[in-house]
Regions:
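Catalytic, metal-anchored helix/loop core of enzyme active sites in primary metabolism
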Residues: 1-252
Length: 252
């Protein structure tokens, strides 16, 4: 039901409705779009960001946790892992594109160089309705997109150094095993600490990085019980990292 996976699904099924889940070889890249959050164009240092500033998302009204994740770009990191698993794609085929207008919800580039994109008003009712009415597209209460009013669309590369949470998510995706579960748990603890003004905005990735470095490697497929255990252990480890302040030594 999320707008980006829904957009990718629509692009894939438009090309091949029955075998979309087996199209990894025909896909060159997935362009996973992100609004960039409230700090996409901010030039000032992010170390001084307050919870109140980080909660001012320019496009979407969401809960506090996911709004902070959008500000750090971790939410897009989670979505990247989601896309890799949903559509059986390697990490190298998923590319993040900062798109402040949130008009293109994602796009698929095929091996021939053609790009299929799904566009629409930035309104979550659209993907939710499509999930309910699939495969039909029914009339919607959402206001139609006026391309003349939109006028222009912007696309920018993400800055992985300025937003290290995104880089950590891709590292966790490459490592696989227990790392994605640990990533999620550590982020949850770090964001909560930031909202309580216990750490700085730029400390969020440091906490996550410290936890990931202490997470044991694991080969093979992870079952639900193992993922749940990894989540619990990473949660406890993140709390310990906050208490002993070892995250302050992290160099990302």
């Amino acid at each position: 039901m999320d707008s980006e996976p829904s957009a990718i699904f629509q692009c894939l099924t438009g090309a091949d409705e029955t075998n979309y889940h087996q199209m990894a070889d025909s896909i060159s890249r997935i362009f996973l779009t992100a609004s960039g959050g409230p700090f996409a164009k901010r030039k000032a240092a992010l170390s001084t960001v307050t919870p109140q500033e980080a909660l001012q998302h320019p496009r979407w009204k969401m809960g506090k946790k996911i709004t902070i994740d959008s500000a750090t770009l971790m939410n897009k990191g989670f979505e990247s892992i989601e896309i890799m698993n949903l559509f059986n794609l390697p990490e190298k085929k998923v590319q993040i594109v900062i798109h402040p207008q949130s008009i293109i919800h994602s796009a698929v580039e095929y091996q021939d160089g053609s790009i299929w994109a799904q566009m629409g008003a930035p309104d979550m009712r659209l993907p939710i309705q499509y999930a309910i009415t699939y495969p039909e597209k029914k009339p919607s209460p959402v206001q139609k997109l006026n391309l003349f009013e939109v006028a222009k669309l912007e696309f920018m590369e993400p800055d992985f150094e300025r937003f290290p949470c995104l880089a950590l998510a891709f590292e966790a995706a490459r490592a696989g095993g227990l790392y994605p579960a640990a990533l999620s748990a550590a982020d949850e603890v770090a964001v909560d600490a930031f909202l309580k003004e216990q750490i700085k905005f730029t400390d969020i990735p440091k906490v996550i990085y410290t936890v990931l470095k202490k997470t044991p490697s694991f080969t093979g497929k992870v079952n639900l019980a193992q993922a749940a255990q990894a989540d619990e252990q990473a949660h406890e480890l993140a709390l310990a990292v906050l208490q002993d302040k070892s995250y302050k030594k992290a160099i990302i």
